[in-house]
């Protein structure tokens, strides 16, 4: 019988893959972003509105020396996770992540989904030649070769059946589309009423999304064991 022996959680922010000298670029991206969503209300604010509400002390933290130290700290923390994982030597990794508009679209958007095919493909991220240095650095933070990752189908099926028995409305999948694409609508409250935007993704070759492939690269260090991916 399977036992839960180790739990690990990690961010997979692009900043974790990028050198500290590129971190300031995210402020420029935020100025262009029309979907700056703030907790706990989920309200959408413009960059200027967010700046007015922000703690003024944050400005003192926005410099290269502090970013460099923060990058060193996050690298050390992820290395610690990788060492903990390696030393524990798990037989199976149940991996829970958010799709973030990569594989699931509004033609079928499950609340949560358990994958129980025999394996799941990963395809390397390939930025355009004219992509920004930040985008290239992010892509390099994921596995650089195509992978066929084994799935522990018996455990995955057990999770599906257990959840059904306990009245959870769980979705399941034994395979993923080779060239997924579609639309996802985002709806947020704002001072002027609800804002709705639609993100369109053209069909393209895609496999295991980045929330999981980041862990494969940085925590598992591409030493593959059977996994159970849960969306």
Describe the residue ranges of each PLM region.
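Active-site histidine-anchored catalytic micro-motif
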Residues: 2-231
